């Protein structure tokens, strides 16, 4: 299946489910089951309840989708000049 055939919708994450799945309510009031795209997992982009997301769906299965973009919330950004916390231990 080529990427041109995918449908894109915007929605809101309503529930975080086990195994990296999410319940998303689309702007047209349909509720679907979605999973995070591989690049989101690779870059450790966390998705929580209430986040605005863009979902790709196949025209053959309109009940499942892939989250490929999470919109940045305005209140979650760190202040300018703030240092990022390191995830490793210096020796």
UniProtKB/Swiss-Prot annotation:
Protein name: Translation initiation factor IF-1
Subunit structure as annotated in this protein's UniProt entry: Component of the 30S ribosomal translation pre-initiation complex which assembles on the 30S ribosome in the order IF-2 and IF-3, IF-1 and N-formylmethionyl-tRNA(fMet); mRNA recruitment can occur at any time during PIC assembly.
Function description: One of the essential components for the initiation of protein synthesis. Stabilizes the binding of IF-2 and IF-3 on the 30S subunit to which N-formylmethionyl-tRNA(fMet) subsequently binds. Helps modulate mRNA selection, yielding the 30S pre-initiation complex (PIC). Upon addition of the 50S ribosomal subunit IF-1, IF-2 and IF-3 are released leaving the mature 70S translation initiation complex.
Positions of the S1-like domain: 1-72
Family the entry assigns: Belongs to the IF-1 family.
Matches recorded under InterPro entries: NA-bd_OB-fold (IPR012340), RNA-binding_domain_S1_IF1 (IPR006196), S1_domain (IPR003029), TIF_IF1 (IPR004368)
UniProt keyword Amino-acid biosynthesis present: no
Keyword check for 4Fe-4S: no
Pfam families in alphabetical order: eIF-1a (PF01176)
Annotated stretches, region: Disordered: 70-91
Entry GO MF terms: ribosome binding; rRNA binding; translation initiation factor activity
Residue intervals passing through the bilayer: none
Intracellular or extracellular location(s): Cytoplasm
Annotated keywords: Cytoplasm, Initiation factor, Protein biosynthesis, RNA-binding, rRNA-binding
SMART domains xrefs: S1
Any GO CC annotation of this UniProt entry: cytosol
PROSITE patterns: S1_IF1_TYPE
